[in-house]
């Protein structure tokens, strides 16, 4: 009997453990069903960020594979629209070409203005040094009547020399004009237009909060999705195990009762020691 009780208890404990493990597994399955929505939202955010190229100022709808080829015109190009050094802004044709994005091949040309710089240098006139006299002692001051005439002639000679020096010094003034010309850069943009249908706006799926819906199982749909189904399955399993154990216990008690009972139809046997006992005669009276 003790062995049977131990077997029943061990079976009951094993069944309870199985029910608990089944309930935990069902709850984990219900949680994992909610995770893919968050992963889809994170992937969509990453794809949306990867379409933008930092620092490129490109429209997100365009492709990021842009080929840039640089070429330049010589400084003596026959382009009469821009005047070097005039500060004239670029023509409207070039600004309009920057905004063209519809064709598959767009060529953008930029013609910056040239900045002229002028530098002037001055060379001071070289003054002739007076030659020293051969002998200072031989210098004599002579006064003559023609000193005034000589002074006038000297003044005229000085003026002529000064004029000649000015004529020669004009050559010393020279103007250096440095013109810095920036070569225009031709940007060849090759892009393939993409249809709007291939890039649908990615939005996070809306979270359904209302429990009212159509269908045969509409009242229970939201509760089953949140793990309520796992609790129901675990409760049903525990109830079935309890019913089985109760039936086993009832059968065990019935069998135990059958072992201690006897059939009423069987005749009673006389005890072996009854012949040695005192028996009263049925026809005689007994007197003490």
From Swiss-Prot:
Stretches of the chain found on the membrane's Cytoplasmic side: 253-288
Glycosylation sites recorded in the entry for this protein: 69, 71, 86, 214
Residue spans of biased composition, Polar residues class: 89-104
Bias (Low complexity) ranges: 106-124
Locations listed in the record: Membrane; Cell surface; Cell junction; Cytoplasm
Keyword terms, alphabetized: Cell junction, Cytoplasm, Glycoprotein, Heparan sulfate, Membrane, Proteoglycan, Signal, Transmembrane, Transmembrane helix
Stored PROSITE patterns: SYNDECAN
Keyword Hydrolase set for record: no
Extracellular side: 27-231
Outcome of mutating residue 214 to A: Reduced heperan sulfate binding
Comp. bias regions, Acidic residues: 141-164
Main location (coarse class): membrane
GO BP terms, alphabetized: cell migration; embryo development ending in birth or egg hatching; epidermis morphogenesis; nematode larval development
Null mutant phenotype: Disrupted mitotic spindle orientation of the ABar blastomere division axis, orientating parallel rather than orthogonally to the division axis of AB derived cells ABpr and ABal. Reduced mig-5 accumulation at the cell contact sites between the ABar and C blastomere cells. Irregular positioning of the AQR and PQR neurons in larva at the L4 stage.
One of the record's GO cellular component terms: cytoplasm
InterPro entries membership: Syndecan (IPR001050), Syndecan/Neurexin_dom (IPR027789), Syndecan_CS (IPR030479)
Transmembrane segments: 232-252
Residues spanning the signal sequence: 1-26
Pfam families found in the cross-reference section: Syndecan
Region named Disordered: 67-175
Membrane-related topology note: Single-pass type I membrane protein
Family statement drawn from the similarity comment of this UniProt entry: Belongs to the syndecan proteoglycan family.
Function statement: Cell surface proteoglycan that bears heparan sulfate. Required for correct mitotic spindle orientation of the ABar blastomere division plane and this may be through modulation of astral microtubule array, and in association with the wnt-signaling proteins mig-5 and dsh-2. Involved in the migration of AQR and PQR neurons, which descend from the Q neuroblasts. Promotes the axon guidance of D-type motor neurons.
Domain notes: The cytoplasmic domain is required for correct mitotic spindle orientation and internalization of sdn-1.
Protein name: Probable syndecan
Native source organism of the sequence: Caenorhabditis elegans
The encoding gene: sdn-1
């Amino acid at each position: 009997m003790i062995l049977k009780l131990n077997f029943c208890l061990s079976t009951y404990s094993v069944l309870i453990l199985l029910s608990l493990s089944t309930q935990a597994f069902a709850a984990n399955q219900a949680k994992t069903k909610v995770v893919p929505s968050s992963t889809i939202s994170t992937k969509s955010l990453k794809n949306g960020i990867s379409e933008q190229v930092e620092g490129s100022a490109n429209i997100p709808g365009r492709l990021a594979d842009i080929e840039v080829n640089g070429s330049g015109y010589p400084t003596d190009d026959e382009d009469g629209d821009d005047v070097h050094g005039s500060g004239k802004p670029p023509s409207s044709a070039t600004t309009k070409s920057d905004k063209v994005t519809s064709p598959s091949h767009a060529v953008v040309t930029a013609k910056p203005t040239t900045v002229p710089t002028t530098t002037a240098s001055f060379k001071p006139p070289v003054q002739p040094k007076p030659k020293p006299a051969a002998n200072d002692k031989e210098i004599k001051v002579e006064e003559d009547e023609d000193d005034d005439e000589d002074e006038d002639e000297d003044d005229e000679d000085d003026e002529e020399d000064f004029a000649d020096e000015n004529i020669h010094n004009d050559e010393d003034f020279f103007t250096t004009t440095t013109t810095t010309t920036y070569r225009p850069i031709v940007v060849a943009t090759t892009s393939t237009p993409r249809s709007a249908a291939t890039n649908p706006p990615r939005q996070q799926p809306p979270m359904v909060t209302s429990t009212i819906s159509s269908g045969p199982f509409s009242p229970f749909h939201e509760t089953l999705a949140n793990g309520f189904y796992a609790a129901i399955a675990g409760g049903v399993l525990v109830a079935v195990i309890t019913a089985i154990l109760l039936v086993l216990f009832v059968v065990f008690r019935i069998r135990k009762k059958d072992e201690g009972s006897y059939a009423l139809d069987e005749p009673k046997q006389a005890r072996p020691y009854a012949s040695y006992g005192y028996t009263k005669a049925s026809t005689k009276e007994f007197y003490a």
